[in-house]
């Protein structure tokens, strides 16, 4: 009589591969975690570097340090002042600033609060900061920096004077009257 031999049942494929796949998945997740930590560290470092550039900008301005001040701007930078007509290219702003700085007179703004964001590509940053100035009171600076040759440079700086909402209509009316409208 023939004896029927049953083949031993093999465990399912997933169970057979588990000893190989599980360690690989663990390594993958660990690597992903390290990459995320590394990206967070890089972003934090970039934010600190951008903040240092802005601190240096305000320090150079208060010391009337022309070369130091403009070394922080990108070649195609634009400065927007508090007046609606004040839109200066870097060169025009240099012309405006040179005479004042040569007399040893700059301008002093003390940073009260600052927020810096870094684009996912790590090469562009934008910021807003609340500032205090003896003549203008509280002002706001905002702008964009770009990473050029490993250094953050200001591509645009916009200085404004925030107006409380309760005063906005009156201020707008006075501006229109000043312009003859």
Tell where the protein language model's regions lie, with residue ranges.
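Short, low-complexity N-terminal intrinsically disordered segments enriched in polar/charged residues
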Residues: 27, 32-75, 123, 166-181
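Hydrophobic pocket/interface hotspot
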Residues: 57, 69-70, 77, 93, ...
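Solvent-exposed loop/turn segments at secondary-structure junctions
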Residues: 76, 84-86, 131-134, 159-162
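Short beta-edge strand/loop motif at the mouth of beta-sheet-based domains
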Residues: 88-90
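N-terminal secretory signal peptides that target proteins for export/translocation
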Residues: 1-15
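Bacterial N-terminal signal peptides
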Residues: 16-30
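Short beta-strand edge/turn micro-motifs at domain boundaries
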Residues: 138-169
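Surface-exposed, charged secondary-structure patches
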Residues: 42, 49, 79, 92-138
